[in-house]
Amino acid sequence: YDTFFGAECGRLLSGSGGVRANEVDQRSMALWYALDRYEAFRDLDYSDADILLINRYILSNAVYQSVRDRDLGNPDLLDFVIELEYNHFRIPRADAHIVLDMNPENAYENVGKKGFRDYVGEQPDIYEALPDIQKRARQKYMEYAKRMPEIHIIPCMEQNKLKSIKAIGELIDKELAPLLA
């Protein structure tokens, strides 16, 4: 989280500022992430880029603000986040979203392998520490994939084990080949 708004997101995710991300209403939290992305893109000249690869884009914002414990039963935020980020802030619209699909247990185990992060140290962030959030997030990504054809689900598990980086990369290459031709 290198921008002003990114640092604020980091404080909310760590709880270090006295307010925790899971205590903030879902639209306000979505706005913090959108402002971070807006700030990151506003001065970036990507006009001559053939491919723009971005980690944790708008889908992540919509997913995680829609699956928090406090927001279960509230309206889904996908349409709000699309309007906010693409139409209002005019950040680049994704031609494709790649979702690396794995079982929630492995996803949770991977949180512990992230190592030191400036905003939380070695600990999981507020969302990563919430019980069942990986399971609900996975379900929400699958739901969004049914609504948006530009979402590509890449199966990363085989017989309950994570596939190799090479095998996952080959699946991504195959999935994106028609877009890059």
Language model regions located:
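NTP-dependent small-molecule kinase module
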Residues: E105-A181
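Structured loop/turn residues at beta-strand edges in well-structured enzyme cores
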Residues: S47, P92, P149
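A glycine- and Lys/Arg-enriched "phosphate-lid" helix/loop adjacent to the NTP-binding pocket
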Residues: N61-Q139
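Conserved catalytic core of Hanks-type protein kinase domains
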Residues: L12, L35, R56, L100-D101, ...
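Short beta-strand segments at enzyme active-site cores
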Residues: L53-N55, L100-D101, H152-P155
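ATP-dependent small-molecule kinase phosphotransfer cores
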Residues: Y1-E83, N87-F89
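Conserved nucleotide-binding/hydrolysis micro-motifs of P-loop NTPases
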Residues: Y1-T3, I58-L59, M102-Y108, Q159
